[in-house]
């Protein structure tokens, strides 16, 4: 899935769109996506100017965005202006290595279960096959007025 397809599914835009490409997707099971991290990311101006590090919460957000793409694929729906995909919870978040400019962040997200509109996922982020971050995520899709 390229960026044009991603933009049709996710409401996120610059500077918070954190999925550049979907490499693999198994509907109802898992997704593998990537984010190319560049020095042009706006968060590097303040985190940290002399030693730029991608904030851990943005790695979590990147996994949540990949999870949203998997959810839409699993349900066979596309979002509209009245559909919102909310991040509902996080458990067991661990950060194992810093991520910086020039890194390619690979997000692997697995759907653990889906019940009553609530999705639970296990996600990991890697750079060069090295674990950078891991967490369990909960998300929900809602219709808004």
Swiss-Prot record:
The family database entries (CDD domains) matched by this protein are listed as: FabZ (cd01288)
Entries under NCBIfam families matching the protein: fabZ, PRK00006.1
The organism encoding this protein is Polaromonas naphthalenivorans (strain CJ2)
Q: Might you name a Gene Ontology BP term for this protein?
A: lipid A biosynthetic process
What PANTHER family is this protein classified in? Answer: 3-HYDROXYACYL-[ACYL-CARRIER-PROTEIN] DEHYDRATASE (PTHR30272:SF1)
Q: What is its EC number?
A: 4.2.1.59
Q: Where in the cell is it found?
A: Cytoplasm
Q: What is this protein called?
A: 3-hydroxyacyl-[acyl-carrier-protein] dehydratase FabZ
Q: Which HAMAP family match?
A: FabZ
Ordered alphabetically, the record's keywords are:
Cytoplasm, Lipid A biosynthesis, Lipid biosynthesis, Lipid metabolism, Lyase
Instruction: Give the gene name.
Output: fabZ
Q: A Gene Ontology MF term for this entry?
A: (3R)-hydroxyacyl-[acyl-carrier-protein] dehydratase activity
Give the residues annotated as active site.
47
Pfam families from the UniProt entry: FabA
Main enzyme class:
lyase
